Amino acid sequence: MIQSQFKLKGTPSSALLGATLGFFFGVMAISLFGPTSTTLGAAMGLGATELGLLVSVPSLTGSLLRIPFGAMVDSNGGRRGFLFLLAAAVIGLGALSLLFTLYPVETPGSMKGLYPVVLLLGCLAGCGIATFSVGASQSNYWFAKSRQGYASGIYGGLGTTSAGILAFALPLLLHRFGFTAAYYILTGVMLLGLLLYIWLGANPPYFQFLKAGKSADVARDNALACGQELFPKGSAATSLKISARIPQTWMLVLCYFTTFGGFMALTAWFPTFWKKGMGLDPMLAGALTAVFSILAALLRVPGGKLSDRIGGEKVSMAALALLAVAGVLMNIPMGWGGLFFVSLLISVAFGFNNGATMKLVPVYVSEGVGGANGWVGGFGAFGGFVFPPLMGRLVDLSPEHGYGWGFLLFTFFALLVMVINYFGMMRKKH
């Protein structure tokens, strides 16, 4: 009745679909440079550390912009911010495509001096990655508390599969259409994502009623009647302040830094690892990266659902323990087949912990969900920018062992997070 009377746009399912599709296209920028890193590195004369920075640079804006844009959901519902981020990504990709048209990228040394320009445009293209915190907060507001793990799993799980798909598809596009045309195709695909979100994306009911001119109290009552259970406590700044005062927010940030930042980092880094570290051809390197990335993305769904049943804390601890072991195993000589199997163990750990972490945000920070999703999604995803240059630096220090040493970073962080979460969340809860 209320939904019809006020012409409420969307339902929980359609809003989740719109957010998931928008994020799906936006987050593919994680793999923007990974599959082409060898070619771009030769064109610009880059070392391993610089390559690590190149493949991770879309994650810089893709992570940090999550904080303000995620918090703004608590002020305006997020649709406007989502559209802005996708539009910026389209512009960045289009500019990169034009740059690659002007310079013969596949000629070694042809782009010397243009490294800062490519980094800058990579940052702009990475804005689409930042849609995560916007859509995550929208999903939390649209769905009942009992189904937020499911919604977060669908959104984060299906949404992030595009990074793995692109890791496999980009080498195929390069082979079939050439370097420049492949990036123009990516620009068109990102534009499609923008158009789909314009069509399907919708603010949660409370914000729609506010926009229709209802008072905050009336909007809240109407939204309750439509099934919305979570409500913001104030402005974006208020939401950030409230969530920042809750210690568990920062525990979840570190947790997400390790596994979602890790997911972003390895999706970008694995093509380099398989090609330069293991000597595999680009097609196979892309395929192995795609399997790793898509599996990690899809496992967020059962990770979220399992967290609904047994608690996100238990799921997270088990996943982190698996990650700690797998990081050590990546240093054992066993050929690319054995290392690929271990990479799938890392994928399982990432997927389940990412699903569990986002389920825990409304559990521990219900007073400022948008702000918390901004902190967790932003600083958490910042790991995607931090890890690849560190892993590249280790390769520069030891070309023989450095590729394996990089995975010990994940072992260290997994153990650290387990200790912090045990004392900061599990013991306090009981």
Which stretches of residues belong to each language-model region?
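Extracytoplasmic gate region of multi-pass secondary transporters
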Residues: 33-38, 246-298
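C-terminal membrane-cytosol helix-exit motif in multi-pass small-molecule transporters
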Residues: 96, 188-221, 417-425
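Juxtamembrane intracellular "pre-TM" segments in multi-pass secondary transporters
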Residues: 1-10, 208-252
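C-terminal ends and interior cores of transmembrane alpha-helices
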Residues: 87-110, 321-334
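Helix-loop-helix hairpin linking two adjacent transmembrane segments in secondary transporters
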Residues: 155-206
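C-terminal transmembrane helical hairpin of 12-TM major facilitator-type secondary transporters
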Residues: 307-357
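Cytoplasmic helix-loop-helix junction between adjacent transmembrane helices
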Residues: 121-158
